Each structure stands twice: as structure tokens, then as C-alpha cells.
């Protein structure tokens, strides 16, 4: 079955790093600031046309709710019946296909993945044999100029393949004979591998490659060599490519923990009317002074979120008070965030960390109404019922991540979290320590089986509907978006995905192969494939 270590998240990060609407927003002096002109309706990915989606199976966190949906000006007008629309309204016959709300990742390092070097073949995340990996690379090669690198940095592990081994140099050559290839995995034992053309590049940069296997002996050096040849336009293209990939899986919203430079690329796409995913940036803060500087330079002084419903500043996270998760600076920094009325997400894995952060939350709640601010602790690998109750009583939320799909350690306790009744959502924490693909996470949440097929989270499985709710309306709660997206309710944005398979009835293993054949963000088509290719924007 290969080797999947019982790695901590820190170990996964170390190894992966080695292998790896109020006002609108403008860029000035390296900061996101209020004040640029309002973008047009297309920038918000909405459509001014009327649309009827008929003969579908609309499923959200409540179960199946309708067979027909009517959309006007990007929002849901009716659920279950067709409203009277303009004469030029379009009707799309869904042919009985299952439709879910657009998936929402409650915590992801999204823009960091967008700036990975090369042309990423992220479909490798859902390859379950060497042949499928080769197919993913060969398919990506069709749209990549010859001589340009095809990559996939993080988000996969060799134990997901039926052969339970790394691909060979020869197998990568066969998949992409005209392109250099560099792929590096997440978790133990996978490392980084390249092909013949890639070997020539790395050796020219002084990076050693094992001649027979194609294993890059120093993955950090290999990644640095690739990053050294990146251009700003290449990073922008990579971010747009990632958006297209996400849309193809039905992912339409993310709470993004990224650095300022990377987030500005998403901002640039938004300003050019090319952003196709709802982006909710988080900002770090090491001290109370950092909070005040962020509020002054990056946020609205009024306490209203800067941006529109497509690109909008969310708040602060994931590490408050510095990289030390139990820093003495945590409470005063978090208190300043509460004073200014902003959302907070805090990295909190262990029981010791949970207790530290909960005590600070309790103290701050005596002075400020954090129950109105959507505060949360994230990761929660082994949180118990008592601590969940404390968090719930504070009006805060529990955001669980699925990076243990790549481990034998198990967790988070999804069943316990759902049963507690707390506001809860899920995210991937990808791509260094996990896969971006939401269907792999939904598989893990409902089966308890990891990337290698081992039962590692037994007793904490949840139903498919419960998992869907955590990945839609539940996740959207963490950025104040649950009133706008995440379920099929009149007045909400028409963010949705028409699926390739019926999520509720397919065999467990097939969940990992589900994708979207038609994705809408605010009623606008952002992804379409057969049989809906004619609707492609």
C-alpha cells in the first residue's frame, strides 16, 4: 500500500514546503486600499439575463428541494416553479442531473497555489493509478506550449495510486515527451520527480536528479529553480488557471489565507472582469499595531467589508499574534480585532492550543460582542464535546480541515462537530498539506477513508447531506456569506454546480470522480462542458 506516515500538520507543512459591497479595492504602494471606481456588473460575475434551469435534481444541505430554478439578474427568483420572465429568457434542460450549491472552501491557501510555477496539472489529485496520472499530464500538455513546464506541487501522494509507488522518469516522458515535468507530493515518501527534459533544466541550475528514477534529490532547490524563472504574468495566468480548475469541480468561493502579493493577483483579475470565484482574503496581524495598520490601509474604516460580493476582504487570520500559536501577543491582538469589529480565524490544532484560544475568546467576549463577528478556531483535529460547547456558547464557529486525508492519524471529529450543533464548516487547507479537490474531502468526510483507502477516521463519518451542508452554507458562514450563497433559497446568488454524477446515490469510490458539467457564479456561466458546452462563456 506504500507509506503514509502518521504525520503532524507541522511535519506535512515542512515536507510539502520542501516539495512545493461598499467600496471596491485598488492597489497602491503594496496595499489594498479603498477608493477605486466601482467595477461593472460583469466584474461581479452576475448576469443581467433571465434563466430557467429545468428538469434537475436540486440538492442542498436540507436534501432535495426542487426540480426547477429560476434566475434573474444573477439571483434565485423562484425554487420549484418557473417564474414569469422576459421573452428572451433562456431555458436549460438539465436532463435530470443533480445540482448542488456552489462549493465553498472555508479555509484554503488558494492564491499560494495559484502562483505555483509552471502549468499545473492539478487533476493529478484525483488520479488513482499511474495510467490516470499520465492521462492527467497528457491532457494538460494539450494546452501548454511545448518546452514549458507541467507541474503539480502538493495535493497528491503516491499511495493514492493502485500501484502504490511514484511514477518513473520514463512514465513521465511517455506522458509529456515535448514538455519538462516536475511533480512533488504531499506527505511521506513521495518527494519530487521529473522527466528527461526536466532533468536537463535542473542540472543546468545545479540541482541534482537521480538519472534512472528522475527523483529530484533536493526538492527545495528544485522548486526554487522553477520559481526563479517565473514572471508576474505567469503568476497571473496560473491564478486564472486555478480558478478555471476550481470552477470545473464546482468550487465557487474561498476564504483565502494568502500573502498580500498573491492576493493582489486575484484582485487584478477582479478588476479586469476575469475573476470567476468568490474571493474572501484574510490578513495576518502580529500585534495590535498591525491590526490598526491593516484597518487603516486595507479595510474600511466604517467596519464594512472592502470590496463587492465577488472580491471582498473577510478579516484576520490564520495566525494572530505571530507564528507562535500561543504567543502572549495573541490576546491583545485579538482584542484589537474585536474592538474594530472584524472577523477572526485562528489556527488551533491541539487541545492545549484550543484551551489557550478559548480562554482568550472568553476574556475578550466580556468586553466585545464576538458572537456577532463570526470568530472561529480552525483545524480542530481532536476537539472534544466540552470545548465545542464552550466555543458554541461564545457564538463562535468550528472550521474543520481535511488535510488528514493524507495521513493515518484520523480527525477531525466531523460527527462530534455536527452533533454539537455549533456553526461549522469545512475547508481543505490546501495545497501544501492537502488537495484542493472538494470531492476528495467529501469522500473523506463521509467514509473516513484516507488517500490510500485506509479507514482512519472511523466513528466520525457524517452523511452526504451533512457533508454538503458543511461545504456550502456552513463554510459560507465564516465570511458572512451564508445569507447570500450556499443553498437554494429565493434572493440568494445563483452559485451552483450541475454534477456529472448523482452525489447522493453513487458508490463511495465514485464520489472522488464527481465534477461539474455546468458551473454558475451569480447566474453567469463560468464553466461548461458536454452536454452544456454551448453555454460556455
Each predicted region: which residue ranges?
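His/Asp/Glu-enriched, well-ordered alpha-helical/loop segment
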Residues: 237, 335-345, 352-375, 379-380, ...
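Extracellular/periplasmic ectodomains of large secreted or surface enzymes and adhesion receptors
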Residues: 529-537
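Non-cysteine beta-strand/loop elements that form the S-adenosyl-L-methionine
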Residues: 308-319, 396-404
